[in-house]
Amino acid sequence: MKESLVNKLNKLKKSFLIKENLSKSFNLIYLKISEIIFLKKVLLGKPLIIGLAGGQGSGKTTFAHFLKLILENKYNLKTAAISIDDIYKTKKERFRISKKINKLFITRGVPGTHDVKFLNIFFKILKNNKFNKSYLIPKFDKSIDDRLPKSKWHHLQKKVDIFIL
């Protein structure tokens, strides 16, 4: 038997160690935003890129995971979600830039430390619906302050309807 959306959401809630009752905010925020995204996708008929903004620790990753779960299970939309942290340049690249421009570039988070070129190429592929092969997206590990090996990157094997960043 297929697991219910409510059960999946409760499991996800536990995985993020959320103790608060989400019923009120869930109905007002998560479901409504998911519905708006679904309707926008239907109207446009092409993949959507959803960007989440907020300070460190504000809940962007948690929000993205809840949206992904709802969009996939309630609306049957193929959804991918990654963190903006995953797009940081490698430690080696940041070190090289820090030697040329400014020592602050060694620290992730400084403007210019994200791989914007990669994102632009990926978004063009997604926008033009030319997603005809599997695609690797970097995965960053803050504990080592660097990208993980390619074997551990996000592996998108399908066209996506919604991409959350």
Task: Outline where the language-model segments fall.
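Charged, amphipathic alpha-helical linker segments immediately N-terminal to NTP-binding catalytic cores
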Residues: 1-29
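Conserved nucleotide-sensing/catalytic segment adjacent to the nucleotide-binding pocket
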Residues: 17-21, 80, 87-144
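Pre-Walker A adenine-sensing motif
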Residues: 31-43
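Short hydrophobic/aromatic beta-strand immediately N-terminal to the Walker A/P-loop
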Residues: 49-54
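Walker A (P-loop) phosphate-binding loop of P-loop NTPases
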Residues: 57
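Conserved lysine of the Walker
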Residues: 60
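Hydrophobic positions on the alpha1 helix immediately C-terminal to the Walker A/P-loop
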Residues: 63, 67
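Post-Walker A helix-loop "phosphate-sensing" segment adjacent to the P-loop in P-loop NTPases
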Residues: 69-80
